[in-house]
């Protein structure tokens, strides 16, 4: 008596679809999926050893080296 049957959940789903519309629910589901994907990617990147950083860190390091060379040339 205390639990919901499948028919209760279907009625709730129909009401939610009527209130919010499918376009809003679809975009909300996409946003949620993207957030979960980014979270998993971030967790996976944390597991990498310090010596194996991503491409972003390499480009930042290269930019720092290039700036240091320009500073040395300017002197």
Swiss-Prot record:
List the GO molecular function terms.
protein transmembrane transporter activity
Q: Does the keyword Transmembrane helix apply?
A: yes
Q: What protein is this chain from?
A: Sec-independent protein translocase protein TatA
Q: How does it assemble?
A: The Tat system comprises two distinct complexes: a TatABC complex, containing multiple copies of TatA, TatB and TatC subunits, and a separate TatA complex, containing only TatA subunits. Substrates initially bind to the TatABC complex, which probably triggers association of the separate TatA complex to form the active translocon.
Keywords from UniProt, A to Z, are: Cell inner membrane, Cell membrane, Membrane, Protein transport, Translocation, Transmembrane, Transmembrane helix, Transport
Q: Name one Pfam family in it.
A: TatA_B_E
Q: What does this protein do?
A: Part of the twin-arginine translocation (Tat) system that transports large folded proteins containing a characteristic twin-arginine motif in their signal peptide across membranes. TatA could form the protein-conducting channel of the Tat system.
For this protein, the parts annotated as crossing the membrane are 1-21
Q: Where in the cell is it found?
A: Cell inner membrane
Q: List the disulfide bonds.
A: none
- Keyword Transport attached: yes
> Which Gene3D superfamilies does the protein's record reference?
1.20.5.3310
| Family, per entry | Belongs to the TatA/E family.
Any Gene Ontology biological process: protein transport by the Tat complex
What are the record's GO terms for cellular component?
TAT protein transport complex
How this chain sits in the membrane, per its record, is: Single-pass membrane protein
Q: Looking at the record, which segments are called Disordered?
A: 41-75
Q: Which residues form the signal peptide?
A: none
């Amino acid at each position: 008596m205390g639990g919901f049957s499948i028919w209760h959940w279907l009625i709730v789903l129909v009401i939610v679809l009527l209130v919010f519309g499918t376009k809003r629910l679809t975009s909300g589901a996409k946003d949620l999926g993207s957030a979960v994907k980014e979270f998993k990617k971030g967790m996976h990147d944390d597991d990498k050893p310090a010596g194996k950083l991503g491409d972003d860190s390499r480009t930042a390091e290269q930019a720092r080296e290039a700036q240091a060379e320009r500073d040395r040339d300017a002197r």
